[in-house]
Amino acid sequence: MSAIYNFCAGPAMLPQAVMQKAQQELVDWNGLGVSVMEISHRSKEFIALTDQAEVTLRKLMSIPANYHVLFMHGGGRAQFSNVVNNFLGDNGQALYLVSGQWSSAAVTEAKKLVSEHNIDSINIVEQINGLYQVKLPDLTAIDKDYRYVHYCSNETVDGIEIFEELDSPWPIVADLSSTIMSHEIDVSKYGLIYAGAQKNIGPSGLSIVIVRDDMLKLPSLPQSSVMDYRVAVEHGSMFNTPPTFAWYLASEVFAWLAAKGGVSAMAEVNQQKAALLYDCIDSNPFYKNGVAPHNRSRMNVTFQLVNDALDSEFLAQAEQAGLVALKGHRIVGGMRASIYNAMPLAGVQALVDFMNNFAVKHS
């Protein structure tokens, strides 16, 4: 069977080696004669798995000792409300930086849970000479006592990524759902990091939350115990039955990434993949991209055909060539190639070859 390269934005492709290992041990995990899906989450075997998963993740991201690592239910949208409920009790206020669809959705969710007067937002994307780019505000010049400032590192729909580090007088809460472990970051600069699993970690239904000790002292709102960060810390992310198979696959992805040389090695490959694809777009008048080069996403490469009447044919022929899930988000249209950690360089090269050939045939 010819190779299939899956460019889906999420749930996204998993490393082939991880999928093959999961297939091999699906019905007999760890010599137990049963699947990892069938054992108690409180068994010594599963506890050993979860302990190792956290150890590996801490090493991969150099997570300081004063941070807790939580494996929680739900995706990024669940954390939109969890952050508010956990940190904005006693009339607390927060600032949201809006760079695209997902950060905007976080604002909308926050305003459902507290008064609109408690949530401030700043649009940080502007269009200059037809290209969208991020302009970070001077947060130190804002005279407000926010509990946190929230931003999304990468807008998967819009193809916009923020590479600059925020200089904030308040704790930073970051949605890293699509960039976690794609390049190195200094975790100590954040109050809380969250990431839905279905892009760079594993299957959907699981979120990783990395939270600093002092954040847990902030006043909270009444909420479900299942989504309370303090309860999750106290119970080792097992207040109730967690999504065990997703946790297992996440642990295997962490091990795979460590074996590949860690986050720094993965960052080099990700840079190569993105450069290869953007070079193809920029060098060919058949395609266009509307994001300024310094804010182009390395994870979600959005592009359009100059002649959009050819979109359907492009997608159909790409699928025939084993290049699937390239259709852009329904809000923005066009094409989107999601090239997370699991996408090999060979997959991006295959896409570039197809794009060049398609352009020649239809020019």
Swiss-Prot record:
Protein's UniProt keywords contain Cytoplasm: yes
Keyword Coiled coil appears in the UniProt entry: no
Bound cofactor: record note: Binds 1 pyridoxal phosphate per subunit.
Residues at which L-glutamate binds: 42
Listed pathway(s): Amino-acid biosynthesis; L-serine biosynthesis; L-serine from 3-phospho-D-glycerate: step 2/3; Cofactor biosynthesis; pyridoxine 5'-phosphate biosynthesis; pyridoxine 5'-phosphate from D-erythrose 4-phosphate: step 3/5
Enzyme Commission number: 2.6.1.52
One Gene Ontology term from the biological process aspect of the record: L-serine biosynthetic process
Highest taxon listed in the record's lineage: Bacteria
Catalysed reactions, as listed in the record: O-phospho-L-serine + 2-oxoglutarate = 3-phosphooxypyruvate + L-glutamate; 4-(phosphooxy)-L-threonine + 2-oxoglutarate = (R)-3-hydroxy-2-oxo-4-phosphooxybutanoate + L-glutamate
GO terms for cellular component: cytoplasm
Residue numbers of N6-(pyridoxal phosphate)lysine PTMs: 199
Molecular function via GO: O-phospho-L-serine:2-oxoglutarate aminotransferase activity; pyridoxal phosphate binding
Cofactor: pyridoxal 5'-phosphate
Sites where the protein binds pyridoxal 5'-phosphate: 76-77, 102, 156, 175, 198, 240-241
Localization: Cytoplasm
Keywords: Amino-acid biosynthesis, Aminotransferase, Cytoplasm, Pyridoxal phosphate, Pyridoxine biosynthesis, Serine biosynthesis, Transferase
NCBIfam families: PRK05355.1, serC_1
Family: Belongs to the class-V pyridoxal-phosphate-dependent aminotransferase family. SerC subfamily.
Assembly, per entry: Homodimer.
Its biological purpose: Catalyzes the reversible conversion of 3-phosphohydroxypyruvate to phosphoserine and of 3-hydroxy-2-oxo-4-phosphonooxybutanoate to phosphohydroxythreonine.
Protein name: Phosphoserine aminotransferase
Lineage: Bacteria, Pseudomonadati, Pseudomonadota, Gammaproteobacteria, Alteromonadales
Gene expressing this chain: serC
